[in-house]
Swiss-Prot record:
[4Fe-4S] cluster 1 binds at C246, C249, C252, C303. [4Fe-4S] cluster 2 binds at C256, C293, C296, C299. This is H(2)/formate:CoB-CoM heterodisulfide,ferredoxin reductase subunit A. Pathway: Cofactor metabolism; coenzyme M-coenzyme B heterodisulfide reduction; coenzyme B and coenzyme M from coenzyme M-coenzyme B heterodisulfide: step 1/1. The heterodisulfide reductase is composed of three subunits; HdrA, HdrB and HdrC. B1 and B2 subunits are interchangeable, as are the C1 and C2 subunits. The heterodisulfide reductase forms a supercomplex with formylmethanofuran dehydrogenase (Fwd), F(420)-non-reducing hydrogenase (Vhu) and formate dehydrogenase (Fdh). It comes from Methanococcus maripaludis (strain DSM 14266 / JCM 13030 / NBRC 101832 / S2 / LL). Part of a complex that catalyzes the reversible reduction of CoM-S-S-CoB to the thiol-coenzymes H-S-CoM (coenzyme M) and H-S-CoB (coenzyme B). It comes from the Archaea. FAD binds at residues 150-173. PANTHER family: COB--COM HETERODISULFIDE REDUCTASE IRON-SULFUR SUBUNIT A, FERREDOXIN:COB-COM HETERODISULFIDE REDUCTASE SUBUNIT A. [4Fe-4S] cluster 4 binds at C594, C617, C620, C623. Binds 4 [4Fe-4S] clusters per subunit. SUPFAM superfamilies: 4Fe-4S ferredoxins, FAD/NAD(P)-binding domain.
Length: 658
């Protein structure tokens, strides 16, 4: 077999690379490397003329290996693979050398050093390219069903979009009702629409949709499999009420003598020991709180449908689906961590979500904002922004995006209820980023007279007798220290990843970002996809966002998983672990390292050997790195390919020194 003929193509990327690297000098160096038949430069290799240049060179010089020195392969590798395929050679005979992010961007101002590094990187790429192999593809069937985990507005929207396309959808939520956080809100900014008025129709549509099956009060326990064939195990918690016969009439709750704090109202109101979380709950089914139930039997006595089941047990469900969407939402920041604000200590320090429940007409105070200490309407309220956001001390350096608008909305609603009330907002920056949001901000100032103080309060003091509060803050615009007497202080608590997000991410096999939210495959080009084919993410589970962005991303996630389900098949490139059975010693180190449970063992010729599941394997290479005998290799990244690349880099360094 003749030696491979390599072509090297260096991209200027406008001035991104050529501004820091002498691309022409790099081309000249590459043309002298062993095995290189042609080297060329072009301002934008990813553009049609650049692609044409590569195709023409393949045909003219009979090239069978291509090295592209350009930007990150995450963006343009598929483009260049398509170029090779169009030219009649395997798309896997491409070696992509990232001389932008790995060189030009980190060595700006050092043209000589950056050029030298680019030469070394390309030399390594050429040696690896010579040893590249074709990669087979495997086709798997995709079950035309999807499980949507989380039934807030994101999960509901994804489920409806998929159901309307004819796909079977399992909409799963751990709570008693679907609706999520949006169900707790009073109104939505900037239009001040009633939140439940626009959410409830979607909740009902999801419940009545012929292609959507609601599974509420259930938790994910295990997920196995791969795109097209995910096996999901759930535990459906007992309601102690038969779902098929309960009519939701409420007679049981009326008879129940026990009242406990209502979690849905954040403890501001009460519920019975047999309850629905809120009046518009879907499904409208009652649940017995066994922790507080005194087993008096009154609920069973008054139930005309005889739906009470005191002996109900948890139920395990096993469901097979082709794809998964994760839309599990968020947790509100625990404001007790900001001890200087006295949340949980001072009665009249509350959070924005608690205000939402107060001003909700169906909430515990029937739409009236009150002081928890005495039930009176506050005459002066202070909102404090960025509580648990943009704060490295509590580990949340990010902006939660919606807190400013929450405060603006609630401040205006409070002024509508009582025009004589005073409302202050202490802020560092007001981030009115969305459509109509800046106008909403101006309305709060000009029409409602909300007062804005640029500064983060240092601390809050309480008068133990009146329960009134004093907020101490520096107005950084005026250069003054202010002490504001307030009846009520509202903390704009930030949005955090769900506490169980790590456990779910592990079951799904997907990554999380440094803030704990689920990590997308690419922040710009694949914002709803994950590293696991067939699993998409949507809503605040991916990162803080408002309702319009959440709905848009939910629709995007539905579209992403609908593609393989519509086709009914999915092609998987077999960049997967392979086993040399003659060398494998059956030590099981690789199985311990595999995060995807893709490695099992079989006995052959009297000893154990590793067996890899080509579909479950994701090609991470952890097993190959750990294998003490070298029996485990990663196709397309075999030892000889990686070592060849290292040798090429070292040899180039010697050449450049001579």
């Amino acid at each position: 077999m003749s030696d491979p003929k390599v072509g090297v193509f260096v991209c200027y990327c406008g001035a991104n690379i050529n501004g820091a690297v002498d691309c022409e000098a790099v081309k000249d160096f590459a043309s002298e490397l062993d095995g290189v038949a042609v080297a060329a430069t072009y301002p934008f290799m990813c553009a049609d003329p650049g692609q044409g240049l590569i195709k023409d060179a393949i045909k003219e010089h009979g090239l069978d290996r291509i090295v592209v020195a350009a930007c990150t392969p995450k963006i343009h590798e598929p483009t260049f693979r398509g170029c090779l395929q169009d030219a009649g050679i395997s798309p896997y005979y491409l070696e992509f050398v990232n001389i932008r992010e790995h060189d030009a961007f980190v060595h700006m101002g050092d043209v000589e050093g950056a050029t030298r590094k680019a030469c070394e990187m390309i030399a390594g790429g050429v040696e690896r390219a010579k040893k590249l192999e074709d990669v087979p593809q495997k086709v798997v069937d995709v079950d035309k069903s999807c499980m949507v985990i989380g039934a807030g507005i994101a999960g509901i929207q994804s489920a409806l979009d998929l159901g309307d396309q004819g796909f079977k959808v399992y909409l799963v939520d751990k709570d008693e009702s679907i609706g999520g956080r949006m169900a707790q809100l009073a109104k939505t900014f900037p239009t001040d629409d009633c939140a439940m008025u626009i959410l409830a129709p979607k909740m009902v549509s999801a419940a009545n949709h012929p292609n959507i099956e609601l599974i509420t009060f259930a938790e994910i326990k295990n997920i196995d499999g791969y795109i097209g064939n995910f096996d999901v195990t759930l535990e459906k918690k007992p309601r102690y009420v038969d779902e098929d016969t309960c009519t939701g009439c409420g007679a049981c709750a009326a008879a129940c003598p026990i009242e406990v704090p209502n979690e849905f109202d954040l403890g501001l109101g009460t519920r019975k020991a047999i309850y629905v979380p809120f009046p518009q709950a879907v499904p409208l089914l009652y649940t017995i709180d066994k922790e507080h139930c005194i087993d008096c039997g009154l609920c069973a006595k008054v139930c005309c449908a005889e739906a009470v089941r005191y002996d109900q047990k948890p139920q395990e469900l096993n469901i097979k689906v082709g794809t998964i969407i994760t839309a599990t939402g968020y947790d509100e920041f625990d404001a007790t961590k900001k001890e200087e604000y006295g949340y949980g200590v001072y009665d009249n320090v509350i959070t924005t979500l608690e205000v939402e429940r107060m001003i909700n007409p169906a909430g515990p105070t029937h739409g009236h904002e009150i002081r928890p200490s005495d039930g009176k309407a506050p005459k002066r309220t202070v909102y404090i922004q960025c509580v648990g956001s943009r704060d490295e001390k509590v580990g949340n350096p990010y902006c939660s995006r919606v807190c400013c608008m929450f405060a603006l909305k609630n401040a205006q609603l409070m002024k509508m209820h009582d025009p004589n009330a005073e409302v202050y907002i202490c802020y560092m920056d007001i981030r009115a980023f969305g459509k109509g949001y800046e106008e909403y901000y101006k309305r709060a100032q000009d029409q409602f007279g909300v007062k804005f103080i640029r500064g983060r309060p240092a601390n809050i003091f309480e008068d133990p007798e009146t329960k009134n509060l004093t907020v101490r803050v520096e107005d950084t615009l005026m250069g003054e220290i202010l002490e504001i007497d307030a009846d009520l202080v509202v903390l704009s608590a930030g949005l955090e990843a769900k506490k169980d997000a790590g456990e779910l991410a592990k079951m799904l096999g997907i990554d999380r970002g440094p803030e704990g939210f689920f990590k997308e495959l690419h922040p710009k080009l694949a914002p709803v996809n994950t590293k696991v084919d067939g699993i998409a993410i949507a809503g605040v589970a991916q990162g803080p966002k408002d309702i319009p962005d959440t709905v848009a991303q939910a629709k995007g996630a539905a579209s992403a998983v609908a593609i393989p389900m519509s086709q009914g098949q999915f092609k998987i490139e077999m960049i997967r672990a392979t086993v040399n059975e003659e060398v494998c010693g059956g030590c099981k180190v690789c199985a311990l390292m595999c995060p995807y449970n893709a490695i099992t063992y079989e006995e052959k010729d009297g000893h154990l050997v590793a067996i890899t599941d080509d579909v479950a394997c994701k090609g991470c290479g952890a097993c190959a790195a750990a294998c003490p005998s070298g029996a485990m290799q990663l196709r397309y990244y075999r030892d000889e390919q990686v070592i060849g690349m290292i040798d090429g880099i070292l040899n180039a360094a010697k050449m450049l020194e001579e």
